[in-house]
A protein has these predicted regions:
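Conserved, structured core segments of small domains
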Residues: 1-87
Length: 87
């Protein structure tokens, strides 16, 4: 396994969609964390007290292809929270 970094930047409807998909997103991350695959996960903010404008997730996967497939199923990705993301 190797570590990969996911960086997602919210789209114009990110805040509303984030609220809609938050519980499912957290549940998905909790499962990965329970499996020992999350090294770090947290929001991107413009300043300490601002609303989240994106996310960073550092996680373990077998390959870049596996990492892309895993993140493609994240509820925030599926729900359109992010305007763009990279791994």
């Amino acid at each position: 396994m190797a570590l990969f970094v996911f960086i997602g930047h919210d789209g114009p409807e990110g805040t509303a969609r984030r609220e809609q998909y938050r519980a499912a997103h957290v549940a998905a991350l909790d499962k990965l964390d329970a499996d020992g695959r999350i090294a770090f996960a947290g929001p991107i903010r413009d300043d300490a007290n601002a609303a989240s404008t994106g996310a960073v997730i550092v996680f373990d996967a077998d390959s870049l292809d596996a990492a892309k497939k895993l993140m493609a199923h994240d509820p925030y990705v599926v729900g359109g929270v992010f305007a763009n993301y990279s791994i």
